[in-house]
């Protein structure tokens, strides 16, 4: 078998320069692709692109394996004139060598809340996007997570398991938050697909990455508890990590959820979740 060698470079989009304190899927990403193409570099490797929490801010500890990171959505690339320059200028930050995640999250959340009030959610594009059942389930979790501001294992029994009835209740009671998150995910998906197509058309392939385990406080664990090693209170029975090696002499504690491997092997179709 012939194997062709390729050159690549690893750089997460968040590490690109930006006026908003964090690299995103906007102009700088396109310019980076141009640089790779010009230098003959064929692979752009990125870290996981999922939603990061406001504690560790780690791409390897996401709240959803399905939804994208809101904070790398390019504000400048939002369409339909749903923002004004004054609003964006108010949240711009100096370009530095480090990301102030708390400031970035606060600023972008403020803009997303403003913009969400101006979006026409009756547009067929949004309605069709929501027809994806997996996206709907994960958005339900993200909305509840934002409402309760706590781990799902601490929620009352009414919110412990997904059902269509729960979705209807969440949608009715927290429609503004749910639709804001829908808008963000719609924009992420559109911007990412456009950026990836641009990369491929310029002879650059995108190499992704996924974490070995998932965050306990995630839609993945909430939706499929039987696939994870949880105790009677739905907390982690054990946590993931790595043994000592040449890089970390004391070993590592990843603090993510272990799998219930026997159940994973039996899992061949979606389980009843109501």
Where are the regions a protein language model picked out?
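Acidic/aromatic-lined carbohydrate-recognition and catalytic surfaces
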Residues: 2-225, 230, 262-263
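Active-site-adjacent "subsite" loops/lids of carbohydrate-active enzymes
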Residues: 216-265
